[in-house]
């Protein structure tokens, strides 16, 4: 089910971006060559909210949780930019023997490189209405309020699951990558749609994964992007 949701999100983002690129190709007189105009670096801030899905052993809807993100960065060339993002809110998962659902909170910080895919394919043009960006980066996350899992262990003395249970506040490394679609509304304002996959160490969800693998969190977010100095 999750694969279908992710594929649908990606197809929507890629489809809208493809229409934009096709339109630019169909009207070469409107297309700006990547070296034809002076480029000015641009700072921006983004505020987004939406839903997160934690990869786990329950139905898709059971593992949905709220998510939010705030970021700031700079577009420093026609193709590349960089940003610092703070994201997170809540993550959910399930333990099956005995069966119970649990949640915890986290905040992730990451430094990311952003590639303007539309400009790479169709040439840079100032004021483009629709653009697709690819981003990737890494940083650290802090988990806290892991109350449900600790309560389950405390209330069941014979329960020996959740082998990687943590208490209090815990720090993790974190990485993520994804796609971002910008729909320009005004000179300094855009609607931003973002889908990303985040990776964490195996103890992020307090339990042992298959082959001590990684824990995954997927986000679908929507919000506003403000360009500064335009």
Where are these regions (language model features)?
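Cleavable N-terminal export/targeting peptides
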Residues: 1-39, 229-230
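Short glycine/proline- and aromatic-enriched beta-strand/turn motifs that initiate or cap beta-hairpins
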Residues: 21-73, 145
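Extracytoplasmic loops and strand-loop junctions of Gram-negative outer membrane beta-barrel proteins
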Residues: 28-29, 53-55, 157-165, 205-207
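Short loop/turn motifs that connect adjacent beta-strands in outer-membrane beta-barrel proteins
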Residues: 31-42, 79, 118-132, 185-188, ...
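Residues that define the transmembrane beta-barrel architecture of outer-membrane proteins
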Residues: 41, 62-68, 105-109, 130, ...
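Residues on the lipid-exposed face of transmembrane beta-strands in outer-membrane beta-barrel proteins
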Residues: 47-51, 70-74, 111-117, 136-140, ...
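Gram-negative (and chloroplast) outer-membrane scaffold detector with strong preference
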Residues: 78-157, 226
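Predominantly the C-terminal beta-signal and adjacent terminal strand-loop region
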Residues: 91-99, 104-106, 184-230
């Amino acid at each position: 089910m999750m694969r279908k949701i992710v594929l649908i999100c990606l197809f929507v983002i890629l489809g809208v971006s493809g229409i934009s690129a096709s339109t630019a190709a169909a009207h070469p007189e409107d297309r700006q060559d990547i070296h034809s105009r002076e480029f000015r670096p641009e700072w921006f801030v983004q505020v987004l909210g939406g839903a997160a899905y934690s990869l786990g052993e329950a139905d898709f809807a059971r593992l949905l949780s709220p998510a939010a993100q705030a970021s700031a960065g700079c577009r420093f060339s026609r193709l590349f930019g960089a940003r610092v993002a703070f994201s997170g809110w809540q993550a959910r998962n399930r333990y099956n023997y005995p069966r119970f659902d649990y949640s915890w909170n986290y905040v992730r910080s990451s430094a990311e490189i952003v590639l303007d895919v539309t400009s790479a394919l169709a040439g840079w043009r100032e004021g483009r209405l629709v653009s697709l960006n690819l981003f990737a980066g890494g940083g650290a996350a802090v988990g806290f309020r892991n109350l449900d899992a600790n309560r389950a262990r405390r209330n069941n003395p014979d329960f020996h699951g959740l082998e990687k249970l943590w208490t209090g506040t815990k720090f993790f490394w974190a990485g993520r990558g994804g796609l971002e679609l910008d729909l320009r509304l005004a000179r300094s304002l855009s609607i931003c749609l973002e889908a990303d996959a985040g990776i964490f160490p195996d103890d992020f969800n307090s339990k042992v994964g298959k082959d001590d693998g990684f824990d995954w969190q997927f986000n679908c977010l929507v919000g506003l992007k403000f360009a500064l100095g335009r």
